[in-house]
């Protein structure tokens, strides 16, 4: 038997024998209507091709059941992993995520924020570009909807969930100093606060351990092309015979990928065994780090906790029936775990 066709919600409500507000209430939360009414609507759905336009319905509300997620890039598996975890958590709580990438561009990031406002999202979880972000755009967003930053932040009082760089960097510096030659530090462009915090934490950790910190300055150009920077910087040092140490601690895993590729191209053996030429370690536990050759020793950020706490804080801010208490955490810094693999 052919399915019945209903073009509008009014048509379908009439076919179900319920009012339009009751039908709308069902689509918001099936458990909110009487069991008999729910059964009638669901029976009608099975015999009809009707699909509610949830997007249009949401736009007619002051606040939707959509959560905006903005990240610098979706091609980086670190952010892809975070988006995936945040997405599933939002779905579990009855919200639909809308994911937008700023592609490393401050202009596109500002455009992404304006798009979220036009879509009337209930709130947003954002990994901003950081130092290049337009603070005014985010201040405007924060006045209109609740937002939470993760991984990095823009100065202000917006809640933030991220890594405790002091703890994580000191942990891996301690390990490298105990297991071999103290590390030199390969820096990245300071695109956000993580870059500066990690460099500063390295210096403090080395001085605390009684060693002289050695920072290899990278390019000061604004770029997120970290693999290329790692490769070119290492190639340049190897070509000049100016590598300042045999243990390199990279500011993040993507930088280390470039370092290891440059070492391989020069015939150098990376690893922690006595016959190896170079040890390489890094930070983040990027999803591909376990698959490099050799597998990369790194500090693993807590993806699950970062995603979970970000959503929890946003939901608390969205809870009109039970507004968040004054004690709601504004800054959550999560510890990282040392993952010892074969590279160092």
Where are these regions (language model features)?
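N-terminal helix-turn-helix DNA-binding module of bacterial transcription factors
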Residues: 1-65
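Amphipathic helical "hinge" segments at domain boundaries
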Residues: 35, 50-122
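Hinge/beta->alpha junction and helix N-cap segments in small-molecule ligand-binding domains
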Residues: 72-81, 99-108, 161-171, 186-235, ...
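Flexible loop/hinge segments that line or gate small-molecule binding clefts
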Residues: 104, 127-171, 181, 191, ...
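Short, well-structured alpha-helical segments in soluble
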Residues: 107-120, 228-244
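Short, Asp-centered acidic motifs that coordinate Mg2+ and/or phosphate
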Residues: 122-125, 247
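Flexible loop/turn connectors
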Residues: 179, 240-247, 253-344
